[in-house]
Structure formats: C-alpha cells, structure tokens
Amino acid sequence: MAEQFQEQGGVATMDPSPLMRWLSSRVVKRICGDASVSKRRAKAESQRVSSGQAHVVEYFHYVEDGYSHLASQVLQAFSERYDIDLVCHLVRGPQGDNSAEPELLLRLSGYDSFHVAADYGLNFPQHEHAPDQRLVKLASTILAAQDSSQFIECAAHVGDALWSGDEARLQALAESLGCASDTELEKRLDSGTARRSELKHYSGAMFYYGREWYWGVDRLYHLEKRLAELGADRQAGEPLLMPRPKVEPGELKDNGSLTLEVYPSLRSPYTAIC
C-alpha cells in the first residue's frame, strides 16, 4: 500500500527511523511543553513592554473562506473587549504544497461553518457551493478599500451578503463603503499574503499575536485567555467572547450499528495527538 503515497522526505517523511521518531517526539514535547510556551510568551511580553508597543493582534482574512466569515463576525466585539490594536489583512488562499484540493477545501469550509456557527452564536447561510466568483471579486474590492477600523466594522456585513448570494446588497455596500481598483486590490492581497508568509503561515481566518497563531473562532479562547493574563481584558472576570463549547456526550451508547471512518494524514501533528 505504501507505493500509493509519495514520499515527502525531510521532517515530513512517512517512514522515519525509530531513532528519528524518538528524537522528534522529544523535540516536539520540549518545544510545546508548558514551560517552553511560558518562557516564549514572557520574552515576547518583555520585548513588547520595552519597545512601548501596544498589544498588536494581526488578523488574516480570506474572502471566499467560510471560516474567515465566521471570524469576521467577532472582530468588532473582540477589538472592543480587549485593549489591542487589531490589524486586518486581506490574503489569498493557500498556495503550493499547502494547497491540497483547494476547491474541495473551500466547499467544506462553507459546509463546516454552517454546521458550527450556531454553537458560537454566529450566523452562516446554508451554502452548498463555493460563492460566485463575481461576488467574491466585488466583496474583495469593498474590503480592500477599508482601513483596519473600517474593515472591523464592515467585514461581517460584506461576508453575509457574499455567502447569501445577495448581489444587490453587495452593490449597495460597494456604493456606501467604496471599492478599490483592481490594481489596489492586487496590491492589498499581495501585501497581506506576503506578511502572512513572513510570519510562516498559509491559511485564512488566522489571528497572530506575540509569535503565536490562533485559527478561527474555535481557537480564539486561547488568545482571549492570554490577553486576559496580560491585563488587556477590559471586562476582566466576564465570560469569554468565544469560550470552548462544552462536549455533551449524551446518554446514547454504541450498539454496534454505527461505523466511524477516520482519514488520518500521516504528516499531521493533529493525527499524532489523536
């Protein structure tokens, strides 16, 4: 069966030696351990304070990505709740080796977002297909014309019109908010994508703060807790904006009638955790 898969080589090899497995495990455990994380965070905070810089959170928005639309709905509340400068970037989709079946990924992002939105108190129109590219272009030109503060205010409205397929509403938003030219749009996308690459990531719906990445609304509670620990929570003691949903196993038990299919990626650290 191994011949069906392409050997990636390097750290992504699918058949490391026992010694390499052991070494990799030790290295990853050391890098990701609580002590190492705390040390890195303390260093980042010390550098921030010494430079006199505010708490700067960068957000990377991929217009036709469902997860980005969910994230856009919390930008306003997030920027108001925490004492931060929220800088918003427009980006292109994953490229190169990071772009595995991009059309399927986009379609599944809409499917996933529709099914999880309610659990976070958010909205996502049911959408069986990727949004129309004409509307994606229009939505992109609207957002490219906004600075970060304007982006925070309007991104969710633009996204809702896009994912609802409401061209008339998008046109109205374009008239009221303005649109970037094609040249300006490309420049904005190039700039945001380059910044994301500089910070060593490839995806949309990403938040970056203090040398760490936080993906979408379902990981935002990690960033909220970190900011609160640094005294940046303007409503200390209040519930988080995006707390981790409780897992309710329910009373039903397996009776042997259901089959769970798992599709692991042997390159993925998530597979190792599972």
Each predicted region: which residue ranges?
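Structural alpha/beta surface segment adjacent to cysteine/selenocysteine redox centers
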Residues: 63, 69-162, 274
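Local sequence-structure signature of Cys/Sec-based thiol-disulfide redox active-site neighborhoods
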Residues: 47-77, 91-92, 254-274
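Nucleic-acid-interacting cores, centered on viral/eukaryotic replication and modification enzymes
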Residues: 43, 59, 87
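Short, solvent-exposed loop/turn segments at secondary-structure junctions
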Residues: 66, 93-94, 132, 212-214, ...
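C-terminal cap of thioredoxin/glutaredoxin-like
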Residues: 3-13, 23-31, 37, 69-78, ...
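Short linear clamp-binding motif
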Residues: 19
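Short, contiguous strand/loop micro-motifs
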Residues: 62-63, 100-101, 179-180, 265
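Short alpha-helical hairpin
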Residues: 33-52
